[in-house]
């Protein structure tokens, strides 16, 4: 089951790829101020969202497709946790823009999961 894997023409891949680039930039800022532990966790979860969405494009079945997006959904939740932790900690860069973009991605991913489940039954 192969679908559109082009970042330029697949909206969810574009959203998650651009978000991953912004997460990398944010984490580099954290690294410069010595906040390595949070940076490492956030970098892993924040870039994994798009990696799993990309993997879903070559899923072996509809069930596998749904599963990959469920993993993306879990990574979204983890990323949200780390960003909110930064938001409420002292001397961390602002996370509001990232949290807003993450909410947009979360809505898209949840819609993909819901519609795929509906069409799968």
Model regions and ranges:
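Short, C-terminally biased terminal segments at protein or domain edges
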Residues: 1-51, 55-121
């Amino acid at each position: 089951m192969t679908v559109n894997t082009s970042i330029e023409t697949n909206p969810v891949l574009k959203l998650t790829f651009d978000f991953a680039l912004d997460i990398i930039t944010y984490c580099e800022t954290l690294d410069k101020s010595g906040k390595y532990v949070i940076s490492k966790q956030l970098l892993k979860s924040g870039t994994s969202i798009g990696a799993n969405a990309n993997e879903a494009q070559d899923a072996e079945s509809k069930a596998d497709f749904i599963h990959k997006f469920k993993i993306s959904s879990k990574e979204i939740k983890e990323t949200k946790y780390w960003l909110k932790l930064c938001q409420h900690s002292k001397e961390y860069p602002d996370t509001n823009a990232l949290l807003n973009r993450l909410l947009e991605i979360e809505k898209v991913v949840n819609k993909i999961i819901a519609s795929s489940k509906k069409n799968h039954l």
